[in-house]
């Protein structure tokens, strides 16, 4: 296979690995506070204002227990 055909087959996103983890902007359903949390949190994440649990660890991705407003890149 010649070089041009090889390079056409693969885009830059195929060659450079991208992280699978994301940061999330979430809103507390109790008090309406918005905060940014890590999608793969390894500890329980609580709201800074009211203390409600927003995310629980599951061994991989965190279980999000509130409303996700935005996924940050």
Swiss-Prot record:
Organism: Methanopyrus kandleri (strain AV19 / DSM 6324 / JCM 9639 / NBRC 100938)
Entry note: cofactor: Binds 1 zinc ion per subunit.
Pfam families attached to this UniProt entry: Ribosomal_S27e
InterPro entries (UniProt xref): Ribosomal_eS27 (IPR000592), Ribosomal_eS27_Zn-bd_dom_sf (IPR023407), Ribosomal_zn-bd (IPR011332)
SUPFAM superfamilies noted in UniProt: Zn-binding ribosomal proteins
Biological process, per Gene Ontology: translation
Name this protein carries in UniProt: Small ribosomal subunit protein eS27
C4-type Zn finger ranges: 28-50
GO function terms (MF aspect): structural constituent of ribosome; zinc ion binding
Binding site for Zn(2+): 28, 31, 47, 50
Similarity comment: family membership: Belongs to the eukaryotic ribosomal protein eS27 family.
């Amino acid at each position: 296979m010649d070089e041009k055909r090889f390079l056409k087959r693969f885009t830059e996103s195929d060659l450079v690995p991208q992280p699978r983890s994301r940061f999330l902007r979430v809103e507390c359903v109790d008090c309406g506070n918005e905060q940014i949390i890590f999608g793969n949190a390894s500890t329980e994440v609580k709201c800074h204002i009211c203390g409600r649990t927003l995310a629980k660890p599951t061994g991989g991705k965190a279980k999000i227990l509130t409303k996700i407003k935005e996924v940050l890149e």
